[in-house]
Amino acid sequence: MLKRCILAENRKLHASPIWAMFFVLPILSAVYGTFNYLQNLEILTDGWYSLWTQHTLFYSMFFFPAMVSTYAAYLWRLEHLGHNWNLIMASPVPPLDLFAAKFAVVAKLALLTHSFVFALFVFCGKVFAQLPGLPPVTLPLFLLRGLLGALAVIAAQLVLAMVIRSFAVPIFLGLLGGITGIFISSKGFGLLWPYSLMQLGMNSNKSADTLAGSYGLFAFSCLLWLAAMFALAWLLLRRQDVRA
């Protein structure tokens, strides 16, 4: 049943307007990051690492939360129309399978987005910044860590989009979560807030590894928030009053 749900969610993406955002926002982030790097070469002297911080800081703080929030709101949009929610609750499909299917689809989109961001990073580094060689192997590791941290954000946004029928409000809350995440991280409490995890994983504001010696705690926090969001979704779906 879960596989059928995933296939159904994937069909929603065919000719979807969210693909325009998928391409535009990472390109805007890359343009801004590259421009900022080239304008501050006297300060940003750490080559690929410095360019990485400029490319990923605003991406992880603004662009990615906005994209994930939009992905989640778009996938729940059909269920919130008319009496569709009542039909879903009466169907033989386990409600949590529906949530898990949406999670799988948004996670796939996040993986594609991260891959596109990294491709733009390498392209800008070679063509515009003219950096020597290839990016250090630690940078793809940062990307994978960021994807792990992103899973908590995805689950949180799917819960918000599930309980809030408005399309815009969950997106606003996602942006707010990303902004508060940078402040919480700066105070040293990033592992306690799901919207900080992706920023920490991407190492988006420092050249030095911010998670050195804390990989276990980071992974635990990501999995804990992910499990908490799935548990919350399960409880809400069991009550069958999300539409209200």
Where are these regions (language model features)?
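Cytoplasmic juxtamembrane interface segments
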Residues: M1-L7, W76-M89, L147-P170
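Aromatic- and glycine-rich beta-strand/loop motifs that create alpha-glucan
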Residues: M1-P26
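Membrane-helix interface segments
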Residues: P17-W19, G82, P94-L96, A100, ...
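Pore- or pathway-lining transmembrane helices of multi-pass membrane proteins that form conduits
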Residues: M21-P26, I164-I182
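Secretory targeting signals
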Residues: P26-V68, A100-I164, S204-S207, G213-A219
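Terminal transmembrane helical anchor/hairpin motif
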Residues: F35-W52, I171-A244
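Helix-loop-helix units of permease transmembrane domains in multi-pass membrane transporters
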Residues: L75-A107
